[in-house]
């Protein structure tokens, strides 16, 4: 999903995808159907583009990713987990390390929508830079 900025050919920022995987044993059910009390992991990918992308990532900027869940109907809504890291010189595409999620907050079976917000900043203190992106991920069903 296009993020901000979208100033081609100078600088673009895109959050490309969001994935869900179950932890533990291999299962024949899709990763979007998760038994209650079974932990799962979420991850996402994002990329910089344009002529200034290589210069920007060389600054070692900190990225912040927060994963959220929203029930479809009554149920739990809130933050699932977060991840942080830093940009690396010469690397414009990033696949986040998976973030383990405890489903303790998701007590009710039901259908839930996952989302992720990524902001790029100069550190944990202070406002983020005007680089941000969002992705609505897959729907999951807690059974």
Where are these regions (language model features)?
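Internal, hydrophobic beta-strand segments that form the core of beta-sheet-rich folds
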Residues: 40-45, 61-70, 95-141
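Short beta-strand elements
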Residues: 2-19, 83-88, 102, 121-143
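Eukaryotic short linear interaction motifs
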Residues: 51-53, 74-76, 123
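Solvent-exposed, conformationally flexible loop/turn segments
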Residues: 23, 36-37, 89-91
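Solvent-exposed serine/threonine-rich low-complexity stretches and specific carbohydrate-binding patches
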Residues: 75-91
């Amino acid at each position: 999903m296009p993020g901000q900025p979208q100033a081609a050919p100078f600088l673009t920022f895109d959050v490309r995808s969001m994935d869900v995987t179950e932890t533990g044993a291999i299962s024949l059910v899709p990763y979007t159907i998760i038994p209650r009390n079974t932990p799962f992991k979420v991850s996402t990918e994002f990329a910089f583009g344009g002529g200034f992308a290589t210069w920007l990532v060389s600054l070692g900027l900190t990225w912040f990713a927060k994963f959220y869940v929203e029930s479809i109907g009554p149920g739990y809504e809130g933050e699932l987990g977060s991840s942080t890291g830093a940009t690396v010189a010469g690397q414009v595409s990033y696949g986040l390390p998976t973030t383990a999620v405890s489903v303790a907050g998701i007590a009710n079976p039901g259908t839930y929508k996952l989302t992720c917000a990524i902001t790029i900043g100069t550190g944990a203190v202070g406002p983020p830079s005007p680089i941000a992106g969002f992705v609505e991920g897959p729907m999951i069903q807690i059974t």
